[in-house]
């Protein structure tokens, strides 16, 4: 089967958003997600959910959007001139979690589907997505667990899938103007449309459903670690890098803003607090320095 079933995809994305929100509420134990539904004049809309000031999660956002239109933004057609003049639909779930405890990493996950159609021609469609981890204080066993889970999700689809999408993730979440990675990576894929729709949809479902099994054990393991002002200040400083990447380099942010998406939802990925410090350097041999030497440089964790 190679004809995309848009209703089937939408149904999965909505149920995935529900499942992720329920599990995050359960582990936080205090706060609930609030929901805002929105419509877009050009076509489509979405539902944005956000949790604020939880016991564990300082802010967590989970967005579903399904937008359509007759003219793609420049961020989408720059590399694909064949899409000019096609009606399009873009749909996906995006998740960004900013914990309060600096020993718990920030995490991001996304699964998405895109289709562009023109009368008399075959539709152009693909899936994309992945997940990545941004620690402030690194733990080798967490990195190994994260990447082992990612590899196990990919393995049924071929032994070459994990290394390929891990490398893509390392390259994508790289802050070029800082010459450093945003975090320790994970998986990133895009333009997935072979061998057929069913294969690509199954893989995307496994990525979406597998994210929490990669992330929540790390949250559980680190949530009781005591922290103070030093750790908090370093966390806020590193969050500044997260902001820089999302506003300067992230294609999803650019696509959303250029296509007239809901700005509040697009910028939900921003941390509630961040800071900058001119010419900061961590103390040699410190836990903060270890992030730069032992965790941010791309490596094979497993």
Curated annotation (Swiss-Prot):
SUPFAM superfamilies: Coproporphyrinogen III oxidase. It catalyses: coproporphyrinogen III + O2 + 2 H(+) = protoporphyrinogen IX + 2 CO2 + 2 H2O. It is found in: Cytoplasm. A divalent metal cation binds at residues 98, 108, 147, 177. The keyword Iron-sulfur does not apply. Pathway: Porphyrin-containing compound metabolism; protoporphyrin-IX biosynthesis; protoporphyrinogen-IX from coproporphyrinogen-III (O2 route): step 1/1. The record marks 177 as: Important for dimerization. One of its GO terms (molecular function) is protein homodimerization activity. Coiled coil: none annotated. Homodimer. Belongs to the aerobic coproporphyrinogen-III oxidase family. This is Oxygen-dependent coproporphyrinogen-III oxidase. It comes from Photorhabdus laumondii subsp. laumondii (strain DSM 15139 / CIP 105565 / TT01) (Photorhabdus luminescens subsp. laumondii).
């Amino acid at each position: 089967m190679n004809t995309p079933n848009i209703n089937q995809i939408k149904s999965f994305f909505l149920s995935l958003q529900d499942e992720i929100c329920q599990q995050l509420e359960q582990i936080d134990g205090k706060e609930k997600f609030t929901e805002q539904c929105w419509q877009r004049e050009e076509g489509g809309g979405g539902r944005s959910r956000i949790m604020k000031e939880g016991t564990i999660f300082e802010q967590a956002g989970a967005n579903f959007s399904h937008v359509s239109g007759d003219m793609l933004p420049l961020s989408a057609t720059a590399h694909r001139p064949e899409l000019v003049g096609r009606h399009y639909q873009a749909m996906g779930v995006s998740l960004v979690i900013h914990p309060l405890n600096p020993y718990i990493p920030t995490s991001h996950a996304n699964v998405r589907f895109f289709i562009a159609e023109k009368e008399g021609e075959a539709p152009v469609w693909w899936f994309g997505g992945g997940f990545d981890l941004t620690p402030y204080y690194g733990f080798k066993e967490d990195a190994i667990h994260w990447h082992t889970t990612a590899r196990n999700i990919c393995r049924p689809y071929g032994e070459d899938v994990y290394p390929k999408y891990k490398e893509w993730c390392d390259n994508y979440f790289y802050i070029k103007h800082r010459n450093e990675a945003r975090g320790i990576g994970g998986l990133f894929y895009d333009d997935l449309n072979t061998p057929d729709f069913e294969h690509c949809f199954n893989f995307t479902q496994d990525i979406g459903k597998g994210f929490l099994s990669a992330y929540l054990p790390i949250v559980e393991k680190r949530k009781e670690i005591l922290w103070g002002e030093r750790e908090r200040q370093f966390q806020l400083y590193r969050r500044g890098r997260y902001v820089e990447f999302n506003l300067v380099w992230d294609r999803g942010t650019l696509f959303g803003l250029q296509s007239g998406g809901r700005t509040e939802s697009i910028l939900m990925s921003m941390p509630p607090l961040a800071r900058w410090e001119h010419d900061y350097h961590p103390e040699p041999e410190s836990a903060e320095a270890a992030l730069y030497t032992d965790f941010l440089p791309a490596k094979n964790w497993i």
